[in-house]
Curated annotation (Swiss-Prot):
Keywords recorded for this protein, A-Z: Isomerase, Magnesium, Metal-binding, Phosphoprotein
Binding site for Mg(2+): 97, 236, 238, 240
PANTHER family, sorted: PHOSPHOGLUCOMUTASE (ALPHA-D-GLUCOSE-1,6-BISPHOSPHATE-DEPENDENT) (PTHR42946:SF1), PHOSPHOHEXOSE MUTASE (PTHR42946)
Active site positions, chain numbering: 97 (phosphoserine intermediate)
Cofactor(s), names only, from the UniProt record: Mg(2+)
Record's function text: Catalyzes the conversion of glucosamine-6-phosphate to glucosamine-1-phosphate.
Native species: Prochlorococcus marinus (strain MIT 9312)
Lineage of the species this protein comes from: Bacteria, Bacillati, Cyanobacteriota, Cyanophyceae, Synechococcales
Catalytic activity entry: alpha-D-glucosamine 1-phosphate = D-glucosamine 6-phosphate
Name assigned to this protein: Phosphoglucosamine mutase
Amino acid sequence: MQSIFGTDGIRGRFNEEITYSLAYKVGYALGSNLENNNPILIGRDTRISGDILLHAITKGINASGKKFINLGICPTPAIPFLIKQEQLSSGIMISASHNPPEYNGIKIFDHNGQKITKNFENKIQKFIEESNQNISVTTKEISLKANKELMDIYMKSLIQSMGGENLSGMKIILDTCYGSATTCAKKIFQSLGADVRVLNNSKNGLKINVNCGSTNLEPLKKALRQSPADMGFSFDGDSDRVIGLDSKGNVLDGDHILFLWGRELMEQKILTNNLLISTQMANLGFEEAWNKIGGLLYRTDVGDKYVHDAIKEKRAVLGGEQSGHILSKINNFSGDGILTALQISKYCKKKNITLNNWLKTSFEPFPQKLTNINLNFNINKVNQKTRILINQTTENFQKIYSDNCRIYIRPSGTEPLMRVLVEAKSHKKVDSLSSEIANKLILEINKIMN
């Protein structure tokens, strides 16, 4: 049996890679392998399939003899926060993050609120394989009433992260993209005194991430043009990432957030070794500007778990990804889009500066283009020999095209895509190289597959 775990838990199209049966088995395997008898916390985003998978997982947990608490629809970061806060044994988030509505996923957290280790993933996998014939889906009905009190505790923690600061006098637009942020983002910002307008704020599992949210900023840009505000924030489906816009529609991505937030911590002398952690996707303009003010940038592979591991290893206090996953010491390094948006808003209010003017003090990004090459297969599911050949091909391309530019090629961890990042000092060079590399790379991959 091929590994059910990818780069960020289990993810795939519902009723294809992610099924009721698999979800039941994961719940059963997790419950059976936990020594701690405290309840397992479960949450989900708004996807239609989320309710079906919730039923399956909870029945599996129940069959294993363990108890669970249903948090209902919630941001992913609520799960790790509450696991630690309430001393629970583990947690599961049912979500496919920024992926389209037809996808779903299962993220598992340990008793410390950290994503489970590779070793524990292997343990779950082995248990499912060995118990495959013995697991039967029970018909016993169990209560799935959502625990609103725990959700209130999470929301209060975000308000408390402001350290007594408020957002009165600030006009802010939020795009909650029909996802998890619909449960609490508006309420939190309003409770802090902000004048809030919210887009796509209904729980709609058919529209989650569709032409909205952190991967499509057009609705937020349009709203800022039609109804001026100080800033806007766009979340993804499970609210663990955020992208901002200033009053003029300029983009505040994860690189800008790290630079501005990191510089504040540096000035307060609480940024360990002036070090930030980011990934291979981080813009070279960001790195050069950060180095110029005395900072260090350590790059990891793409994925917040790699950033998290490097933060722990290097004893850093801040890290993240260009995509808007920001991990800070405030909440034990769990990516939280709402927390990040609050911190950026707080600094603007405290410094008495507009986001537009603050953003101008950061850096000028190098032209950068990310091209998605559609494959008719998921590279993570091909045999090892084929995967090695494809990896060797991408490494060769990165070496061949490394003069006067930066190339980074990687497969998507969740979709049948190869992502090609090209970065150079001119848009013309970026465009021509992106097209050339994408065309040649797909030919080479097709040769390997045929």
